[in-house]
């Protein structure tokens, strides 16, 4: 009886842990350049060479062209994902310390038209 109770208790803890585990804020998608990180809509995510120290350097008109992958106020870092505070006070997801963005000129899933723009924008890869 003790063995069965211990197994049932362990299973309950495991299910509880899984239920409360936060999922990653990105997905992995396919593109002509291989695997890329995507947002929840499947749009390619990018990183910016001018971002430094976990801080976004893309604000104002830059952020209009390169919308940040926003994080909700109650979002929590998970695994390789962290949250940075933008100059406007908004929250943005970062992967391995690099803030993540979409590109306004990508129109469908799998597009990677922002890769290499001005030699400072690159696809985010898993």
Whereabouts are the PLM-identified features?
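Compact beta-sheet-dominated domain cores in extracellular/mature segments
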Residues: 2-7, 17-126
